[in-house]
Amino acid sequence: MKFLFYLSADNLEIARKEVLVLAERYGWVEDYQFEERLLLLDYAGEKFFERLAYTNEVTKIYDICSVSELEQVFSEIPVYDRLCCVRVKGGKGKTALERKLGALLWKRGAKVSVSNPEIVYKVYIQDDKCYVGLLEFERDTRQFFLRRPDRRPFLMPSAIKPKLARALVNLTGVLEGETLLDPMCGTGSFLIEAGLMGINPIGIDFIEKIVRGCRVNLEYYGIEGSVLLGDAKNLPLRDESVRGIATDYPYLRSTKAAGTLDELYSKTSEEFERVLKKGGRAAIVTNIDVESFFSNFEIEMKTEERVHGSLTRRIYLLRR
């Protein structure tokens, strides 16, 4: 079965990898193709679309055709006894095309409603290629606004925003009921997103005030999780006890509480390797290149996001 993912433009590397990691964990990927913001996935398995952060829409593909063949496709595509409309992305004159294709459906007995459709026929135009199908999922962007860091009871500056936090949790491939660790949890951005997806979150921080505040934030969102006082360099966890790790490293060159960052990275790398299950992933955010510290891991992805003039985040996906 083919699905087309219309990806967020925020970061295509993250968007593509997020889809592929989850698809591999929930089912079987037969094939996939990238074309700018489009990802065509031949997939069989459980649907995971509600988890996605960096995908705007998912459409179940009916046909792939040229622009000149669109009317023929819409003369054959199934119609249903429910309100429907046609929505087009890409190409020129999309409003006129939506009306023309909607009229073809109406002539075939479809109930057309632009304002309140129950079924949406999607057409994505890329050059002369058209992807035609039925909309399966559309991301509600309000959820991220409602969960932004400044709306939490416990606040800290520079907290990771919910959209990126959810994407990085997804990059680890952790499923419902499995355990995700954030060993430098701060206000709990990763833990919140993990908990809302049915994942068991464990957070650790070395400052007692932050541990208490993070617990308050989890309780605010109705999330059951463990937040412990501890040191990321010496994790109070058993070997191979977590399925994934997502964390945001401190950005200063050194910190009084944690020692030098070189020490922090070298020791946390050892601890990540110890507590991660074999094949488990760690999604980490940092402001320095860390390949030398994680030489025992496979680097599946490295990308960058500019935060402001003096800060560019590096985002790594590491596999044990």
UniProtKB/Swiss-Prot annotation:
Q: What Gene Ontology terms for biological process does this UniProt record contain?
A: tRNA methylation
Location of this chain's protein in the cell: Cytoplasm
| Catalysis: reaction(s) | guanosine(10) in tRNA + 2 S-adenosyl-L-methionine = N(2)-dimethylguanosine(10) in tRNA + 2 S-adenosyl-L-homocysteine + 2 H(+)
- SUPFAM superfamilies from the UniProt entry: S-adenosyl-L-methionine-dependent methyltransferases, THUMP domain-like
Q: How would you summarize the oligomeric state and partners of this protein? A: Monomer.
The cross-references to NCBIfam families, in alphabetical order and at most eight, read: TIGR01177 family methyltransferase
* Protein family per UniProt: Belongs to the methyltransferase superfamily. Trm-G10 family.
Any idea what job this protein has?
Answer: Catalyzes the adenosylmethionine-dependent methylation of the exocyclic amino group (N(2)) of guanosine at position 10 of various tRNAs. Acts via a two-step process that leads to the formation of either N(2)-monomethyl (m(2)G) or N(2)-dimethylguanosine (m(2)(2)G).
- The name this protein carries in UniProt is tRNA (guanine(10)-N2)-dimethyltransferase
Source organism: Archaeoglobus fulgidus (strain ATCC 49558 / DSM 4304 / JCM 9628 / NBRC 100126 / VC-16)
Query: What is the organism lineage in this UniProt record?
Result: Archaea, Methanobacteriati, Methanobacteriota, Archaeoglobi, Archaeoglobales
